[in-house]
Regions:
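Ankyrin repeat (ANK) tandem alpha-helical domains that serve as protein-protein interaction scaffolds
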Residues: 1-265
């Protein structure tokens, strides 16, 4: 009991220690829970540099226990206005990356879900959660593969495509290119992926991923258009711009490439 009192004293009566070693470890949601403990913690948080965060909403994706999720579930009146139904709650629970919390939402609360749940699991590379979603017939669409590609989760993408037979579309290549995941693009070629559109080269160019841009053009034979040049130029990726010019990529209307110089309007 004495030890608990000493810890409590450190938290509420030693700002130097608390502000340096305790509050920085709390996410925004934890901070709001601390604030609500009692009058002492409310004063503490208001004294800190993080008091402005109290105005922000709880984030279900930051919650780490069933007890905190229970509170969020019971306070539906405080859910964001853009949550059209409870499937958004399940989606956010999946973002916690904790399967036991998703199981609680589904099995204890009978929370409805949609494809957003498995998309969140795919982006985080949580194979165990994805297998749970598949086993329990969570809706799935082509965004699951795209989300795995976006975060470079090759094993997840392989599982979704080869085991689950999940569909994929042009976003899979484009989102892989956006974050420079060359290994994902190589896998797509290996699997004879044929959903390329000009978005993939545009993403690679505007984000400065020259290796991906080269691979898309030379190996994957992905199409491109003037947006690739514009994107690379506007985002200051001269190596990508030069590669596009050397390969005769179409230019935006009014732009010219003459005598080794690019003229824009």
């Amino acid at each position: 009991m004495r030890a608990q009192k000493d810890v409590w004293d450190v938290i509420v009566n030693n700002d130097d220690i608390c502000f340096t070693h305790i509050l920085p470890r709390l996410n925004q949601t934890d901070l709001k829970f601390l604030y609500d403990v009692n009058s002492e913690t409310r004063k503490l948080v208001k004294r800190s540099s993080r008091k402005g965060e109290l105005k922000k909403r709880f984030k279900v994706s930051e919650m780490s226990s069933i007890s905190t999720l229970e509170l969020a579930w019971d306070k539906k009146s405080l859910w964001p206005s853009d949550w059209e139904d409870e499937t958004y709650f399940c989606w956010e629970v999946a973002k916690t990356n904790k399967l036991e919390l998703l199981k609680w939402a589904r099995e204890e609360k009978q929370c409805k879900w949609d494809e957003g749940t498995i998309n969140a699991a795919a982006e985080q590379g949580n194979l165990e959660m994805i297998k749970y979603c598949v086993a329990n017939e969570c809706p799935i669409d082509e965004d699951a593969c795209a989300c795995a590609a976006l975060s470079g989760q090759l094993e997840i993408l392989k599982y979704l495509r080869e085991e689950v037979k999940a569909p994929w579309g042009s976003d899979t290549a484009a989102w892989a290119a956006q974050d420079g995941h060359l290994h994902i693009l190589e896998y797509l070629v290996e699997r004879k992926y044929d959903q390329y559109d000009t978005w993939a080269c545009w993403e690679a160019a505007k984000c400065g991923h020259l290796d991906c841009l080269k691979y898309l053009h030379e190996t994957a034979k992905a199409p491109w258009n003037y947006r690739a040049v514009r994107g690379a130029h506007e985002n200051k990726h001269p190596e990508c711009v030069q590669y596009l010019l050397d390969k005769n990529c179409p230019l935006p209307d009014g732009w010219r490439y003459e005598h080794g110089e690019l003229h824009t309007i």
